[in-house]
Amino acid sequence: LEHLTLSMGAMLAGVPFSAISPAYSLISQDFGKLKHIFEVLTPGMVYASDGQVFSKAIQTCATSDIEIITNTGIVGQQSCTSFQSLLDTPVTNVQEFYQTLDEHQIAKFLFTSGSTKLPKAVPTTHLMLCVNQQMLLQTFPEFEQTPPVLLDWLSWHHTFGGSHNVGIALYLSL
């Protein structure tokens, strides 16, 4: 839920985000795909649920000016911001940021699997996310009468899990 909270906050603030496959951090030994993604995105913030688990990947790929957010654990000697401290921050200017959102702004970047080479960034706008959900509702009008029960194991870094299924839950207020 922390990832979803950060994602929704980023979209509301008009800051594009990207969910990255954990395999690029936890299975890869050279972090080649993750390094490539860092070069493409130049992130200002990185979130890892457990800093210690993702420490090697973060230390290898993230520059010292990138803010690291964790639920637990530390990343080497690097200073990390706790996720809880973000929740404890007083809310300001939300309406102001909301008013500046444009449907054509990039909401998030999805990445291809990289099975043919390096992962490629796929920009996804706010409009694309909304239109996709409206298309689903028109394709499956019964969703409005009887909302589906989602048993979801799909990763949020994948378009099906992160856009389709999360979108259904948000769009139908599940």
Regions found by a protein language model. Give the residues of each.
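Conserved AMP-binding/adenylate-forming
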Residues: 1-28, 148-155
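Short hydrophobic alpha-helices that are characteristic scaffold elements of the AMP-binding
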Residues: 7-19, 36, 40, 158, ...
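A short helix->loop->beta-strand "cap" motif at the edges of active sites that frequently abuts
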Residues: 15, 43, 63-67, 174
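Internal alpha/beta domain cores that form substrate/cofactor-binding pockets in large enzymes
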Residues: 18, 56-71
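Conserved ATP-dependent adenylate/AMP-binding module captured primarily in the ANL superfamily
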Residues: 24-60, 88-91, 132-151
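Conserved pre-ATP/AMP-binding loop-to-beta segment of ANL
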Residues: 69-71, 75-111, 117-118, 142-150
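Conserved AMP-binding/adenylation subdomain of ANL enzymes
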Residues: 130-149, 156-174
